[in-house]
């Protein structure tokens, strides 16, 4: 792990921020919303607005509020009951934030997203345009996953990931992940009192992922590993990440003033174009193509397109234009991108030179399976 030192938080220079607030920071230990806590976050974000900063808030808490409104003491396991609780609770969550921000003369907007919204290029661009319009109008967007319609197979899984995707979507300067932990430790501090705190590191450092466990409260679903991976995602759009305790007094305003709180993960990874960022942010891939060593080298080190001659195997079913993963012979993903041929056609032309595509398929739409402009090395 490569550590860095910094006297001033990276948040102080950020003009556009995404702040993610976990369930435990807006609920009464999972039993409905904590209105005082909601007001506390609204006050801090209002202060950031006064400084000219644009803020998007990614907030959990809908299911916990729904359970309280429905009188449920135990979190249900059935998907349809969780979705019902989310639908009921989202009303309360929006009402609470609307009332809290109104105290400071600010309007709020509800944005509910699913993975399908961000996987579809047109819907992705529409969501992006809407968020930009809201920010220009001085509105505070409140973002959450659309739990009512999402399925297990296409869930973001946690709001840490959603926060990173929104960060990339709006090209934010920084992502702040607020949790019930101080930040990142080299081991779980609840099990190892001698665990050392990590104040500064580089987003995407493999050593961070290796040492991260599933630290987190019983209310939320996001452990430290999801936060580290979220920081890695955000870094590819140039955004720095801070993982800090939401229990710290006025944590957002103090970060904005330059105080170093929590773990700061600086963005040092190559910044991808908006299109390549969209490709990289796909959480659900339609299939995989297994590449030989020569093809892997061509993608990773020569910036080449993927040709059918370098494909050893096709896994899964997909159509032309789907996002497909490229993996090496050991199953490790090395790239992903838009495929030019269906899985059925790819199986027919794998291991063949591009000059044979028309003969085998009857016509050739593209000489490449994936053009280098439509793939991203991961």
UniProtKB/Swiss-Prot annotation:
Gene3D superfamilies: Acetylglutamate kinase-like, PUA domain
An example Gene Ontology biological process: L-proline biosynthetic process
GO molecular function: ATP binding; glutamate 5-kinase activity; RNA binding
Binding annotation for substrate: 60, 147, 159
Pathways involved: Amino-acid biosynthesis; L-proline biosynthesis; L-glutamate 5-semialdehyde from L-glutamate: step 1/2
Compartments where located: Cytoplasm
Keyword Signal among UniProt keywords: no
ATP-binding listed as a keyword: yes
Catalytic activity, reaction form: L-glutamate + ATP = L-glutamyl 5-phosphate + ADP
Keywords recorded for this protein, A-Z: Amino-acid biosynthesis, ATP-binding, Cytoplasm, Kinase, Nucleotide-binding, Proline biosynthesis, Transferase
Enzyme Commission identifier(s): 2.7.2.11
CDD domains, alphabetized: AAK_G5K_ProB (cd04242), PUA_G5K (cd21157)
Coiled-coil residue windows: none
A GO cellular-component term linked to this record: cytosol
Record InterPro entries: AceGlu_kinase-like_sf, Asp/Glu/Uridylate_kinase, G5K_ProB, Glu/AcGlu_kinase, Glu_5kinase, Glu_5kinase/COase_Synthase, Glutamate_5-kinase_CS, PUA
PANTHER family named in the record: GLUTAMATE 5-KINASE, ISOPENTENYL PHOSPHATE KINASE
UniProt function note: Catalyzes the transfer of a phosphate group to glutamate to form L-glutamate 5-phosphate.
Protein's name according to its UniProt entry: Glutamate 5-kinase
Organism annotation: Bordetella pertussis (strain Tohama I / ATCC BAA-589 / NCTC 13251)
Protein's gene: proB
């Amino acid at each position: 792990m490569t550590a860095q030192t910094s006297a001033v938080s990276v948040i102080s220079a950020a003009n556009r921020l995404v702040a993610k607030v976990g369930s435990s920071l807006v609920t009464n230990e999972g039993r409905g919303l904590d209105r005082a806590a909601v007001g506390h976050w609204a006050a801090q974000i209002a202060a950031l607005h006064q400084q000219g900063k644009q803020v998007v808030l990614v907030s959990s808490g809908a299911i916990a509020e729904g359970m309280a409104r429905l009188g449920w003491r135990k979190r249900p396991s059935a998907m349809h009951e969780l979705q019902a609780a989310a639908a009921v609770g989202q009303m309360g969550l929006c009402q609470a934030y609307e009332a809290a921000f109104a105290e400071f003369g600010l309007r709020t907007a509800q944005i509910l997203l699913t993975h399908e919204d961000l996987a579809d290029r047109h819907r992705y661009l529409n969501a992006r345009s809407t968020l930009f319009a809201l920010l220009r109008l001085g509105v505070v967007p409140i973002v959450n996953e659309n739990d009512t319609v999402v399925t297990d197979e296409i869930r973001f899984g946690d709001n840490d990931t959603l926060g990173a995707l929104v960060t990339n979507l709006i090209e934010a300067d920084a992502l702040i992940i607020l949790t019930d932990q101080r930040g990142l430790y080299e081991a779980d501090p609840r099990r190892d009192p001698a665990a050392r705190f990590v104040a500064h590191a580089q987003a995407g450092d493999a050593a961070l992922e290796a040492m991260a466990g599933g630290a987190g409260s019983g209310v939320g679903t996001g452990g430290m590993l999801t936060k580290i991976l979220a920081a890695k995602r955000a870094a590819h759009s140039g955004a720095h990440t801070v993982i800090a305790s939401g229990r710290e007094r006025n944590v957002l305003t103090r970060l904005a003033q330059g105080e170093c709180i929590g773990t700061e993960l600086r963005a040092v990874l190559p910044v991808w174009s908006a299109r390549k960022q969209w490709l990289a942010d796909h959480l659900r891939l339609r299939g995989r193509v297994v590449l030989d060593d020569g093809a892997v080298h061509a993608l990773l080190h020569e910036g080449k397109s993927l040709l059918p001659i370098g494909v050893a195997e096709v896994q899964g079913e997909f159509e032309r234009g789907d996002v497909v993963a490229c993996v090496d012979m050991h199953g490790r993903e090395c790239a992903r991108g838009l495929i030019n041929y269906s899985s059925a056609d790819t199986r027919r032309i794998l291991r063949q030179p591009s000059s044979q595509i028309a003969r085998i398929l009857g016509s050739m739409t593209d000489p490449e399976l994936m053009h280098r402009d439509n793939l991203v090395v991961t």
